[in-house]
Amino acid sequence: MVRYAATPANPAKSASARGSYLRVSFKNTRETAQAINGWKLEKAQKYLDQVLDHQRAIPFRRYNSSIGRTGQGKEFGVTKARWPAKSVNFVKDLLRNAQANAEAKGLDSSKLVISHIQVNHAPKQRRRTYRAHGRINAYQSTPSHIELTLTEEDEIVEKPVEQKQIRLNSRQRGRLASQKRLTAA
């Protein structure tokens, strides 16, 4: 079994999935993963579908030099955002895989939350292109390793409001007793 970067607090209520040596852009995939980290599974899947339809965008916070601006980034407080379709499809496939793993464990898929998602660099793949005057230029692709963990969140029960008991000193108790006698008479 392969070791994950983060171990879940309760492995019985968690399900994981990972993809290694995936031929998809590291930078785009990292931004896609950060956009949905901590979200509920159903919300994340719906959001990624909307990104593919260009209804919403992935905010680019770190790897955002020389990319265009769009108004769809306003909901995240950024001006630079994109629609990286290939990265979104890879992340969606891993989410679907992790959801199937969770259902096999008997977890409720409506309560699943993306508790951990991480994208790492895979070894670069080297290629070459032939240029004019007999020159050769090398170029590389930057594949990724992706891992994610879904955790079934516990229901949050609100603490009941306790009535605060007022502590009175003897002088305050005497004054309160005399006021009660006056109002009773």
UniProtKB/Swiss-Prot annotation:
Alphabetical keyword list: Cytoplasm, Ribonucleoprotein, Ribosomal protein
Gene3D superfamilies on file: Ribosomal protein L22/L17 (3.90.470.10)
Principal localisation: cytoplasm
Subcellular location: Cytoplasm
Quaternary state and interactors: Component of the large ribosomal subunit. Mature ribosomes consist of a small (40S) and a large (60S) subunit. The 40S subunit contains about 32 different proteins and 1 molecule of RNA (18S). The 60S subunit contains 45 different proteins and 3 molecules of RNA (25S, 5.8S and 5S).
Protein name, UniProt field: Large ribosomal subunit protein uL22
Family listed: Belongs to the universal ribosomal protein uL22 family.
Highest taxon of the lineage: Eukaryota
One of the GO biological process terms: cytoplasmic translation
